[in-house]
Amino acid sequence: MQKAGAGGRRASDCGLAPHRPRCITKFAQYVGLLPCGRPGHPGERVAGAAAAVGAEDCPRRRAVILKFSLQGLKIYSGEGEVLLMAHALRRILYSTWCPADCQFAFVARNPRSPASKFFCHLFVGSQPGEVQILHLLLCRSFQLAYLLQHPEERAQPEPCPGPTGEVPLKPLSSSGGLVREPFGRDQLSQNVHALVSFRRLPAEGLVGSGKELPESEGRARHARLGNPYCSPTLVRKKAIRSKVIRSGAYRGCTYETQLQLSAREAFPAAWEAWPRGPGGHSCLVESEGSLTENIWAFAGISRPCALALLRRDVLGAFLLWPELGASGQWCLSVRTQCGVVPHQVFRNHLGRYCLEHLPAEFPSLEALVENHAVTERSLFCPLDMGRLNPTYEEQDCGPLGRPPRTLRPLSHAKSEAELQGLG
């Protein structure tokens, strides 16, 4: 493998590309990388083992900036000047996170490397929410990339209850614009230095028309909702005065939309090929739920296709979607050694969530999933937060005569694992 120059590559030295895809920027600490086998093979639970060993053997950490897009993941130095690594999405095999250790890890191969040679890259944060969002962004990028490659397998529009089973999602109509929705108290960041962004939801009308609701109507809407958290200035001042802020990042109301805007910009031909109307990409962009719920349900893809992909995923991978025509009921499908096993999840009269034939009750679906991810005897196997990339390619199909683009490795990374460009 060709080594990169010692001087590194600065972002300003890469030249201006004709198109720079939209990306989502996050911060973390890079611990290191370890050679590993393919996830899902017997005895190889890459994420947990590599993360534990990496945390012990690599005490030297480095602050980095991660930039997510539908083309891949780029990692810059803490100052944002030096591009340290770049991973095309098609070369990333697997992503996972460990809330107990505040760790995020993904498994990728190098360009033109053997299909059996992988490296696990480990990152840590100061609290679980910081690393969880890294994992969620990468997983949803996997799914959106698959949807763009296989538009024939998209889900057909059908009425279904929302994430909590209380209010059904409304289809988009044909005129109007976007409105700003106030923040809920549980959506406020615990970080004073975090940027405040509005939650943008579809108004009744044509998405992307750029027309805003009249100011008077917007004020009336906020007054009806009775929520004071509608101004970024007020949100920031109240957070500072309350003195309850902790390190963290804004829980993403807009991450889903940002990823889909990245998809539209990175793959304009595939995006425009999607049909217009209720079943098109506009419904996928604006009418689904949160980032976590979209990943659990593989939002936008048909259920038969989602189940087929689940059968190829790692043991413990799961899908969770609301039952059609039933309020307060969900289907939890888990990939086990016996195949995909479905379980019924319901919400009782106390508003708590239960799994069929099990007495335990949980205040939310997230709590239910987290519990069964660490409990081994409740299901056929514990739930696994990791996800395989359905768009992963074992070989590079680019021009044979094109030399690989190399980048400067991290100072504490092994030379044999120097990372290369997105190419």
UniProtKB/Swiss-Prot annotation:
Coiled coil: none annotated. May be involved in synaptic plasticity regulation through the control of Rac-GTP levels. Interacts with BCR. PANTHER family: SH2 DOMAIN-CONTAINING PROTEIN 5, SHC (SRC HOMOLOGY DOMAIN C-TERMINAL) ADAPTOR HOMOLOG. Residues 394-423 are annotated as: Disordered. This is SH2 domain-containing protein 5. The keyword Chloroplast does not apply.
